[in-house]
Amino acid sequence: MSDSQQSIKVLEELFQKLSVATADNRHEIASEVASFLNGNIIEHDVPEHFFGELAKGIKDKKTAANAMQAVAHIANQSNLSPSVEPYIVQLVPAICTNAGNKDKEIQSVASETLISIVNAVNPVAIKALLPHLTNAIVETNKWQEKIAILAAISAMVDAAKDQVALRMPELIPVLSETMWDTKKEVKAAATAAMTKATETVDNKDIERFIPSLIQCIADPTEVPETVHLLGATTFVAEVTPATLSIMVPLLSRGLNERETGIKRKSAVIIDNMCKLVEDPQVIAPFLGKLLPGLKSNFATIADPEAREVTLRALKTLRRVGNVGEDDAIPEVSHAGDVSTTLQVVNELLKDETVAPRFKIVVEYIAAIGADLIDERIIDQQAWFTHITPYMTIFLHEKKAKDILDEFRKRAVDNIPVGPNFDDEEDEGEDLCNCEFSLAYGAKILLNKTQLRLKRARRYGICGPNGCGKSTLMRAIANGQVDGFPTQEECRTVYVEHDIDGTHSDTSVLDFVFESGVGTKEAIKDKLIEFGFTDEMIAMPISALSGGWKMKLALARAVLRNADILLLDEPTNHLDTVNVAWLVNYLNTCGITSITISHDSVFLDNVCEYIINYEGLKLRKYKGNFTEFVKKCPAAKAYEELSNTDLEFKFPEPGYLEGVKTKQKAIVKVTNMEFQYPGTSKPQITDINFQCSLSSRIAVIGPNGAGKSTLINVLTGELLPTSGEVYTHENCRIAYIKQHAFAHIESHLDKTPSEYIQWRFQTGEDRETMDRANRQINENDAEAMNKIFKIEGTPRRIAGIHSRRKFKNTYEYECSFLLGENIGMKSERWVPMMSVDNAWIPRGELVESHSKMVAEVDMKEALASGQFRPLTRKEIEEHCSMLGLDPEIVSHSRIRGLSGGQKVKLVLAAGTWQRPHLIVLDEPTNYLDRDSLGALSKALKEFEGGVIIITHSAEFTKNLTEEVWAVKDGRMTPSGHNWVSGQGAGPRIEKKEDEEDKFDAMGNKIAGGKKKKKLSSAELRKKKKERMKKKKELGDAYVSSDEEF
């Protein structure tokens, strides 16, 4: 093919035939044209003249359909000639215009031709093709043309997915604008094209949110909820321009929301997204949308804390984007611009004789080079493959390759090189060798860090609470870590803390069998190897203690033939014997293990390597925990629980009437026994103990011995089968359960602040309202039928309303039902009026109405000013005492918190009412060593009593004085100093509370000043003054309180 006289003559004849073709022979002639153009090529020539005529034919209404049909046939040829391709792309604007033609046939042919061109063009030539489509859709007012272009863009995603991903920053604004078109057909097509385009966002973290992100573009009212959803998402994949292009429209609108909370949340996400950006050019195209919104919010938001967060995001954006002090937005790099690469090509060709007719081909080469730069393709052979066919159109192959290689070198000099991994000295089979980033919600945890694991090695992970240890484990298990091998390549099993409650009635054997890990015989053998008896294998999971549940989860993981075991605090629920068994198993099983543990002795006995969180990186240290501490001095804080900068503080408990010393018993249990319904013997029996404000008690014993059952009876979760349990009338007990998340699992979509407001909105703790000691059972109902003789009439108590001091105890105001015809068929009980209320001493009431008395006692305690105002500031201050930042308390949903942060929230909520006794069931389960050290110090300084169930002798050795050893259902106390009466020691004086007091509605209670006792002389003087006034005024005299 050439512009020689012979070729021109043939093409002119074909074009004449094409111009007068009818619908019947149009396809045949178009096919002849395509075959000729894509046939044998005469070297160094192009069909410039023919395509010029073809362009005129497309613009002519009479020949448009035929001309476009020829283009479609040319594009549909399997061997599209490089000499033809650049010229076809130049026809796209004219074809787009015809897609909006009034003639339906021309419309249809134009739409089909656009699809054919998109599918035929080299994907790396997208920078030559896409601008024609986006310019046409912006400039046209014809809705049919817009729909055809949108269909072509959707087809382009399939034809050139990787290349479209890089063009998303300029494509998304065009599609977004089209989604607001007034024509519903255009809206639908634009939404479909946007959905198709977002397939290029290869980011597992936001895949499920993409429909919501698209919906936000069409419906801005969805922005607040979507911002919340993204705030609780774990980001582990690299944030690319494609990811930012779909996220930034949401965030820019979030910055413009009326609600301060959404503006603030958007700023937090921007702040943390920017921290993941190492190349300023990635964020550069989006600075114009984010920077003005942040600046405006910083200047106008009234909330100082939200303004501070906005300023932090602003500083981060300026730093990452290289924004100057004058806030002038720097230019985006032009290295990948077609104009830049065209200039380079023209400079290299200036000494060559290149005819003007090849100008379009040269521009096409520049467009391909620009895309290769954007894709960071720097391989010489790749450039030869993509560009040589076009450059040899006007140069000999050798010359073309020489110039092309120089073009490549000039273009890629400043492209960042990918990460280099240092080889380990340790030999062995690699299971994993990857680089990735990790975030949790709006917090960046790891940024472009390396993880390399070998087969049959044992690794421990260390780091402060909230740094992302458990998040990393879950991300690995869920396949969300970039570069980590899939489950097919390397079976990775995450051993959970707890077994899902939905399996509580399933037998141990069936539970493992349902996982599809083998036959029942093989499962049974493995469970026996793990220490399970035949009886335990047959019992339901709910009957297992926490330690045995952990062993069951571990056994199931081993049965799955794991290559890597992920163990998150495996010793939490295990006693000493089972911990020793686990150490031996991990050291001999030959399975790679990654362990998170706050037990330094366990890490010493198991680990060969320690992986430490340092900054936003993972750093590996060879050796066990002791060796790690030697190499990393900063890790010495792990050795001593009290060696930490983190501080916890529990609120001071309120005054208890009648309790003059810290030794006086405020809880006392005598001859107590408890047996679960349906069991053959009591779980605990013959239990005697007492607790005071000075108690520091450790409850120890093997798994299943009855420790948690004993504490449940103490706190009122369970009622004893027999025996007596005395609790001071105003005593408040904070109980943090072994499975701490049980407190908050139904409130995951609330913020911590909202959860505390919900829990205490009535003044009472709603978490304790369903305790057994507050529920009226059949025995209580029968006892409450007791008949009292009041003023000679038989009465039953209808309600107890208030309380007042009576000698050394209390008496209670009761309303009654009056009995008529008692013992007869016509017996009835009639409500009496309030004037018939009477006061009954506590001793008489508790025999039959103890739970009603307890309710009044609780309300009286709250009415005396123990209630705290449920304001954001008060809640944030209280939670900060337990190590929770205001950012987390008021602006993060519970679902997005780490395990350690959730337990801190449970501690904060449990101590909101200033308890007198704090009961902790396995507090070492989820807190890291820093937090455990802070908890240890706070418990030492706490003014109330402390009871701890734990297997960790290290945690309790310097904290507790009294030990309750529970074994086989019996409790043996030691180290106790129980007293009868007040006991010795310093006296507790009731403090005049200087702080403001509030009732249950948050209203300030005015505290009256205590009256000064008058002397005898002052009393006589006042009496004389009263007598004088009475004499002067006569019957008009009315005395006042001030006169006495």
Curated annotation (Swiss-Prot):
User: Which one GO biological process term can you cite for this protein?
Assistant: cytoplasmic translational elongation
Task: Name the source's superkingdom.
Answer: Eukaryota
Q: Which residues carry this modification: Phosphoserine?
A: S642, S974, S1039, S1040
Which intervals of the chain are annotated as region Disordered? Answer: 974-1044
Which Pfam families does this chain map to? 4HB, ABC_tran, HEAT_EF3_GNC1, HEAT_EF3_N
* Activity regulation (UniProt): Inhibited by the translational inhibitors neomycin and alpha-sarcin, which suppress the ATPase activity.
Indicate the segments forming the ABC transporter domain, all copies.
426-641, 667-993
Establish whether keyword Lipoprotein is in the entry: no
Modified positions (N6,N6,N6-trimethyllysine) are: K187, K196, K789
Q: Which GO terms describe its cellular component?
A: cytoplasmic stress granule; cytosolic ribosome; ribosome
Basic residues bias located where?
A: 1007-1031
Q: Which CDD domains does the record cross-reference, listed alphabetically? A: ABCF_EF-3 (cd03221), CD_eEF3 (cd18626)
Sites of the modification Phosphothreonine?
T972
The EC number(s) this enzyme carries: 3.6.4.-
Which reactions does this protein catalyse?
A: ATP + H2O = ADP + phosphate + H(+)
This protein's pathway reads: Protein biosynthesis; polypeptide chain elongation
Q: What is known of its domains?
A: The heat repeats and the C-terminal domain are necessary for impairing GCN1 function on ribosomes, and hence preventing GCN2 kinase activity in amino acid-starved or repleted cells.
Q: What else is known?
A: Present with 870578 molecules/cell in log phase SD medium.
Q: What is this protein called?
A: Elongation factor 3A
Q: Give the source species.
A: Saccharomyces cerevisiae (strain ATCC 204508 / S288c) (Baker's yeast)
